[in-house]
Amino acid sequence: MAADAAPGPARTSFHHAGMIVAIPFCSVDAPDALALLEWIEVLGGVREHTCLLTLDAAVQWSTASAIAAAAQKSFGNVRIVSTEEPVEGWPAGPNALWLEAARFAQEQGQPFLWLEPDAIPLKPDWMTKLAAAYALLSPSCFMGHLYKTNSEKFPPVVMSGIAIYPPGAIHLV
């Protein structure tokens, strides 16, 4: 974390009913993460789930704390994890954040929804429906949108990053 950083919560095992909702952000995305959490509150919150704020080390602790306070209004549990060092650029930055969320989910033995700050839920029961749909799948399944690509840099079909990942996803990708 950045200069005004205080150490975040230690990664201790806890189990909370529901699913982990990982919201990743860097300093640039912080206002969008806050707006997303304010919108989730307007939709009625998702108290049965855990919010995992997954942030880049360059995010100021004061910013992370303010976003955590917003998350506490909608989620039953709020946790924060951070990269050890700032990671800039695409895809290195998002990939580093995803790895932090995947490590946390593995430690907790829970699946996680990777919800980027520009992925906006539309209905009050959005997370209940997603969690119920995922519960019907095998515990090691990935649940997300598949789409075709026309790039030589990617396989012909990829899954959108905004998806639900199994607890052991870090070892499956």
Model-derived segments and their meaning:
Residues 28-44, 62-66:
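Short, well-formed alpha-helical segments that are part of the catalytic scaffolds
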Residues 17-20, 43-53, 76-78:
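Short loop->beta transition adjacent to catalytic acidic/histidine clusters or analogous donor-positioning motifs
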Residues 1-16:
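Non-catalytic N-terminal targeting/anchoring module and adjacent flexible stem/linker
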Residues 109-120:
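Short beta-strand-to-loop acidic/aromatic patch adjacent to the donor-nucleotide binding site
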Residues 35-39, 66, 96-100, 125-133:
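Alpha-helical elements of Rossmann-like donor-binding domains used by nucleotide-donor carbohydrate transfer enzymes
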Residues 91-94, 119-173:
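Conserved catalytic core of nucleotide-sugar-dependent glycosyltransferases
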Residues 20-32, 56:
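A conserved hydrophobic helix/loop-capping motif in glycosyltransferases and polysaccharide synthases
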Residues 54-109:
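Active-site-proximal specificity loops/subdomain of glycosyltransferases
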